Amino acid sequence: MRRKTEIYSVELNGTKDVKPADQRDDKKFKGAKNKDLEPNKSHEKEELKKELDLDDHRLSNTELEQKYGTNIIQGLSSVRATELLARDGPNTLTPPKQTPEIIKFLKQMVGGFSILLWIGAALCWIAFVIQYVNNSASLDNVYLGAILVLVVILTGIFAYYQEAKSTNIMASFSKMIPQQALVIRDAEKKVISAEQLVVGDVVEIKGGDQIPADIRLVFSQGCKVDNSSLTGESEPQARSTEFTHENPLETKNIGFYSTTCLEGTATGIVINTGDRTIIGRIASLASGVGSEKTPIAIEIEHFVHIVAGVAVSIDIIFFITAVCMKYYVLDAIIFLISIIVANVPEGLLATVTVTLSLTAKRMAKKNCLVKNLEAVETLGSTSIICSDKTGTLTQNRMTVAHLWFDNQIFVADTSENQTKQAFDQSSGTWASLSKIITLCNRAEFRPGQESVPIMKRTVVGDASETALLKFSEVILGDVMGIRKRNHKVAEIPFNSTNKFQLSIHETEDPNNKRFLVVMKGAPERILEKCSTIMINGQEQPLDKSSADSFHTAYMELGGLGERVLGFCHLYLPAEQFPQSYIFDVDSVNFPTSNFCFVGLLSMIDPPRSTVPDAVSKCRSAGIKVIMVTGDHPITAKAIAKSVGIISANNETVEDIAKRRNIAVEQVNKREAKAAVVTGMELKDMTPEQLDELLTNYQEIVFARTSPQQKLIIVEGCQRQDAIVAVTGDGVNDSPALKKADIGIAMGIAGSDAAKNAADMVLLDDNFASIVTGVEEGRLIFDNLKKTIAYTLTKNIAELCPFLIYIVAGLPLPIGTITILFIDLGTDIIPSIALAYEKAESDIMNRKPRHKKKDRLVNTQLAIYSYLHIGLMQALGGFLVYFTVYAQQGFWPTSLINLRVAWETDDINDLEDSYGQEWTRYQRKYLEWTGSTAFFVAIMIQQIADLIIRKTRRNSIFQQGLFRNKVIWVGIASQVIVALILSYGLGSVPALSFTMLRVQYWFVAVPHAILIWVYDEMRKLFIRLYPGSWWDKNMYY
């Protein structure tokens, strides 16, 4: 058994000793950012992926002072601070090494097919030099070499521009770093640059400040922090000096670098700076995690290897053949150039890029902003989605979900746009409860929002108070008016010790001048303060039966993963508390017991209304959705069930144990079809156990997980050969976003670091947008197959003329430059047009493609394109070629082995089949005519090829011949380019085109019709005999 995966077992500053700072070995810390501290990068990455192992949260203040050689009152001396700054370096994050832009550009110049074209260009210039030396130089090879270089440079620039994406992850982390810090040094308070902070410094923070380093709190007063970017917790977290948890990420006496203090004040000792802070470690981890190659990049690389392999193989075979047939080496080199150009689809990679760009634009309109174009298809290949809960699956706002009063549970409306609540509001108990909810609340709407819908108004207050305020406003209206009429005279804010909030109000009833005390807080604490309970508007003694009803409701609501609050009130006797009475909240000169319990209210961050349907679509599409959250397991499970990540009929081990009333250990784990796994459980798992979990359970929720555990979950999924999509919004998500096959950041709630690490940004933070992206991704894969099949088909029609030219010695049927006009002229727009083709069937009802089995270019596609349709096109081209020559007097048989005489400049009396003599110029003109006719023949047949590529299985009549209008724009572009080349540029000798007789345009039409009929028969038999030999070998 391998050792257990320690998730983030990090040594503080590289050492686990707790010596005073003065006694530690400074050599270990000098130049902490130098390479000599990174002898093994893979080892360092593994260290980064381990759980934080600190003990500072366990130490007393005295031990802390001793460990760091500091004093809570006086702080460090300036001299010592200078020494530590020189030793540890500034409190900043080290930027990663960047690949120079010129290197990125040069990679585009030699990637893909470019290297073959460079070879072709080099051979052109070599041929020219040889000809020049032999005094027979022709500028044709110079022109061709220049054109090939131009093609490489232009496609390289295009690819560089289109594929450039943000890799500056560290820069976004740096934006989060606080600029100034209030520090105590030499017994004086000083404002210094945060970069100058050192371990042992004593710093003070207040509401609104960013914490300038990892600190251990030694004083706190009402301090709350926002840790959401690090831990995923959406609720403000209280901070105190108490050691409350073994895990340093969850204890209350540690504050983390770059998190925000929301309210209160605190003083702390700096325990980590710069790269050694939690955010520093995450930044290093994100930068150190290598971006995985996207599936489409792997497919294109695979395709390039196939085409390059075919080109090189044919080159070698025919070079040897040419030499064996006594051709000059120079001629053999020229053959090589032609075969390279004929084999390489020069415009294809640019076409793929444009196709991906068009899809990316479509997705942007559907709120998916694609940063990395290849991610467009990756999303369609996704087989596992690891999704955050807060903000992605949920609405990212606390909302009132249930109420309990009069011994009944009422369901509240949790939809995004609440306009009213449907539960019974006629009871007197509800009147009292609604008053407490309204008055015992410090949240307020920002002014000037009267015309804004209530649920979209901006509120000053925390998440829970905001939910209660909006709930009250929807039902009662004019909450601020109610508060004015019930003036607040005293208040005890909520704190973690009391666990309640209390306020005292004058009442608006002119006949009742008693003060009203309202209280809300933890239900069990509120119940302790009550002696009566309100039922149907009447106070009754709080007996055992009522208490039991309370506990039943409390457990039921808590079991739904909702945050439950209790509410009670007390009218103060007018004779003891007259209108002139001065309330003192410090001495508490008023009653805090014998209240009347009114009811319970529970809140939750509810699911988005579109998510359940989106999850259902994922399941139909064979995609496993895994929830990974930092939230509580009960809450996570409740949301997972409500959105369908855990199906209604599927049980976890805990559910089975509860149903059978037995211990969890007694349940056979294989009986459960769903699993809820906590971060602590994951920490104790070996990689093999994680693999087993991911394999055996289709429905999984990971709760209370750390960011590093999220990365390990992603790696576990990838070990299953899954293509993994990960959503995230916080700094903590950056490593997992970068490691995933496709990282998806939140556009609204997402941090800069998350957006930079991701490949895609959801502009509306909505999980349903991912499913839309999956559909687009699957469609683009299908359409790319069609595009490649279309592009490859003509390669055989371009290659065969050179092979016949070499073997049979015919006059050259088509020139190299003419081929480039096909690849980069007539075929570009039609290739792109296929990106607009609609799906043939419901692509969301099939399983994700297997990244090793379902290839973009498979054997069936290559055989059908090359050997079926490709050979038909070649035959059609030769039919036109021989027709042109026959009409001019050269029968096909007379052309065999005529090449040498045909190309000899000194022969000006070459006889045709009728005895007519041809000069060298006349023969050259006829050669250009034959080449132009061959070009037109390929173009005509490519029109048929374009139409049949609209579908792979359905008849084009089922798909709709005119459904994709862009196809017809592509066809029109082919004809227009051919007309311009033939009739517009036909007089330019270097281009080898001539003005073609009208009848030659129609010679290849029967072949085009044959191609269409043949393909319709192929599709018919595939539909008639699914699963047959024909289906397996003829469907690509």
Swiss-Prot record:
GO function terms (MF aspect): ATP binding; ATP hydrolysis activity; metal ion binding; P-type potassium:proton transporter activity; P-type sodium:potassium-exchanging transporter activity
Active site: 388 (4-aspartylphosphate intermediate)
Tissues where the protein occurs: Expressed at high levels in distal colon, coagulating and preputial glands; at much lower levels in proximal colon, kidney, uterus, brain, placenta and lung; and at trace levels in heart and forestomach. Expressed in distal colon epithelium (at protein level). Expressed in anterior prostate (at protein level).
Activation and inhibition: Up-regulated by K(+) ions in a dose-dependent way.
Catalytic activity: K(+)(out) + ATP + H2O + H(+)(in) = K(+)(in) + ADP + phosphate + 2 H(+)(out); K(+)(out) + Na(+)(in) + ATP + H2O = K(+)(in) + Na(+)(out) + ADP + phosphate + H(+)
Region (Disordered): 1-50
GO cellular component, one term: basolateral plasma membrane
Topological domains, Cytoplasmic: 1-99, 165-300, 351-784, 836-855, 951-964, 1020-1036
The entry's keywords: ATP-binding, Cell membrane, Hydrogen ion transport, Ion transport, Magnesium, Membrane, Metal-binding, Nucleotide-binding, Phosphoprotein, Potassium, Potassium transport, Sodium, Sodium transport, Translocase, Transmembrane, Transmembrane helix, Transport
Record topology, Lumenal segments: 121-143, 321-332, 805-814, 879-930, 984-998
InterPro entries: ATPase_P-typ_cation-transptr_C, ATPase_P-typ_cation-transptr_N, ATPase_P-typ_cyto_dom_N, ATPase_P-typ_P_site, ATPase_P-typ_TM_dom_sf, ATPase_P-typ_transduc_dom_A_sf, Cation_transp_ATPase_P-type, HAD-like_sf
Biological process annotations from GO: intracellular potassium ion homeostasis; intracellular sodium ion homeostasis; potassium ion homeostasis; potassium ion import across plasma membrane; proton transmembrane transport; regulation of pH; response to metal ion; sodium ion export across plasma membrane
Binding site residues for Mg(2+): 729, 733
Transmembrane segments: 100-120, 144-164, 301-320, 333-350, 785-804, 815-835, 856-878, 931-950, 965-983, 999-1019
Keyword Cell membrane: yes
Biased composition (Basic and acidic residues): 14-50
EC number: 7.2.2.19, 7.2.2.13
Location in or out of the cell: Apical cell membrane
Keyword Metal-binding in annotation: yes
A Pfam family of this chain: Hydrolase
Subunit structure: The ATPase pump is composed of a catalytic alpha subunit and an auxiliary non-catalytic beta subunit. The alpha subunit pairs with the beta subunit of gastric H(+)/K(+) ATPase ATP4B or the beta subunit of Na(+)/K(+) ATPases ATP1B1 and ATP1B3; this interaction is required for the formation of a functionally active pump and its targeting at the plasma membrane.
Function per UniProt: The catalytic subunit of a H(+)/K(+) ATPase and/or Na(+)/K(+) ATPase pump which transports K(+) ions in exchange for Na(+) and/or H(+) ions across the apical membrane of epithelial cells. Uses ATP as an energy source to pump K(+) ions into the cell while transporting Na(+) and/or H(+) ions to the extracellular compartment. Involved in the maintenance of electrolyte homeostasis through K(+) ion absorption in kidney and colon. In the airway epithelium, may play a primary role in mucus acidification regulating its viscosity and clearance.
NCBIfam families assigned: ATPase-IIC_X-K, ATPase_P-type
Family: Belongs to the cation transport ATPase (P-type) (TC 3.A.3) family. Type IIC subfamily.
Protein name per its UniProtKB record: Potassium-transporting ATPase alpha chain 2
